[in-house]
Amino acid sequence: MLNRVLGMVTMVTMFPAVALAQSSVATDVTRAEIDAVYETLGGSIDKQIKVVDVGKSTNVAVGILERGALETEGQVGAIVHHDVTEVYYILEGGGTLVTGGPLEDTLEFPPDSAAVTELIGPSGRGTFQGGVSREVSAGDVVGIPGGVPHGFSRIPDRIKYLSIRVDPDQVLPAGYVNPVIEK
């Protein structure tokens, strides 16, 4: 299944570029690269692996994330990316992912922060109730459009997942390769 998702990442990054005749080369993200960047997470929950310009003023990024055990009652801590769409591919573990619903007490990330300029684009965080809850586990794929609040209400142990980020405003740095894997 991971090979299929990596193939989808290659197709997403290659097809628009070929259609626009901007490039005839695909961008690969190998399992070895994912593992190498994952090993550097440390206290962070999110690291970018690569960002590629796919044409039509759009970048696509691939990041690796891991979150530890979590249990909430009522309000869920959430994030909203104003323009960036995310596609999660769950590698290990699982939990309850909640999407939608109104975001309350929103705090915007500083526009010059690494979170905005390297990882997720312009975004805010806050809490929300309601929305749609779904159980996710290894092998599942979830698409979260830009502007949709999302967060986990429960993670029994941990969850490790890839985030494929479609950045229509090219805020994320095209050509970025995580220094751990840069050749």
PLM feature spans:
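His/acidic/aromatic-lined binding-pocket segments of jelly-roll/cupin-type domains
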Residues: I79, E86-Y89, S133-R134, V141-V142
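Conserved metal-binding segment of the jelly-roll/cupin
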Residues: R134-P156
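Bacterial N-terminal signal peptides
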Residues: G7-A19
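Positively charged n-region of N-terminal signal peptides that target proteins for export
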Residues: M1-V5
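Short, conserved beta-strand element in jelly-roll/cupin
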Residues: H82-L97, G101, F109-G124
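A short hydrophobic beta-strand segment most commonly corresponding to one strand
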Residues: D157-G175
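A short, N-terminal "cap"/entry segment at the start of jelly-roll beta-barrel domains
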Residues: A19-H82, A174-K183
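Short alpha-helix capping/helix-loop boundary micro-motifs
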Residues: T127-G131
